[in-house]
Amino acid sequence: IEWVEDRLVGDVAPMAGEETALRLQEMDLFQGRKDETIADLEGRMKQRAVKAGAAIYSIGDQDQELYLIRRGEVRIMAPISGSRQLHHIATFGRGDFFGGLAFLDERARGDNAIAHTDIDLFVLSLDQFNQLAEDHKKLAFLLITAISRTLAQRLRHADGERTLLQV
């Protein structure tokens, strides 16, 4: 499965040097939002550049941050069935987000996020999100709904893969 995913991502992703970093309003989560709302949100986010191979977060980290990928790819690695060995779980690219579980449930990270290529990120902390929600309730609701739906889709996909592997 990982081999197929790598081939598919490689077929559609531009070369790392050619890829431009997305602006916030270009991301699917925020299309159609008012310019002033986007500007307020962007002012609350950090921007972070991470070199290929570097950890973005690790198992056990207590941060409650949501990461939005402006450019590049990140691989999610996690132990399976109590093993200490990490397995590739997913790859996310330009326009995707990751880190949603710890952002929503405020628990420690259960996986590692590793930059597969050099990446640029928008980072939204839970504290900043809560402040944003006071001023932009509709945007906060839409963001939480989008995160929840995406996580549900990813869980269904992972459950389907697990079922296939058991056959």
Description of each model-found segment:
Residues 3-55, 103, 164:
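Cyclic nucleotide-binding regulatory module and flanking cytosolic helices
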Residues 53, 64-81, 93-96:
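Glycine- and acidic-residue-biased ligand/ion/polar-headgroup-sensing regions
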Residues 55, 73-75, 112, 120:
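Residues located in well-ordered beta-strands
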Residues 56-61:
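Short phosphate-coordinating micro-motif centered on Lys-Gly-acidic
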Residues 62, 84-85:
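Short alpha-helix capping/helix-loop boundary micro-motifs
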Residues 87-145:
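Cyclic-nucleotide recognition modules
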Residues 145-167:
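Polybasic "coupling" helices that flank or enter modular domains
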